[in-house]
């Protein structure tokens, strides 16, 4: 969407993030299969898509706000049951999500501080 709107820089960053998310899903699916589980990839949550760039980032930010505590809880559970391989996978994902959270927070704050239009110009 961002590239279609003319925001190449923002589109490239979000594309990188989407590939990162796909890799996270692959790692989790591989681990679940290794543990003789069946991954549930059919359960979909509400998709949050904004109608303009800053709103899109705010939607992504809300997803990270929920994901980070969930990941921390899952890491604690893995430690409790001594599943250190799953814990390490989840820690790696947590690191990535925290970086994305920080980037999103910074971009949203910048759009507010320098003005939405100025920020959007910087994303072209």
Regions found by a protein language model. Give the residues of each.
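Iron-associated oxidoreductase/ferritin-like identity signal
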Residues: 1-124
């Amino acid at each position: 969407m961002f590239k279609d709107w003319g925001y190449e820089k923002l589109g490239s960053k979000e594309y990188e993030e989407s590939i990162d998310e796909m890799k996270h899903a692959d790692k989790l699916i591989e681990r679940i299969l290794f543990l003789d589980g069946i991954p549930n990839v059919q359960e979909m949550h509400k998709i949050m898509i904004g109608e303009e760039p800053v709103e899109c980032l705010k939607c992504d930010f809300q997803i990270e706000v929920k994901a980070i505590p969930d990941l921390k809880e899952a890491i604690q559970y893995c430690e409790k049951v001594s599943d250190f391989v799953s814990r390490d996978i989840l820690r790696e994902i947590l690191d990535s999500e925290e970086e994305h959270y920080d980037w999103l927070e910074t971009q949203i704050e910048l759009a507010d501080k320098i003005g939405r239009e100025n920020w959007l110009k910087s994303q072209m």
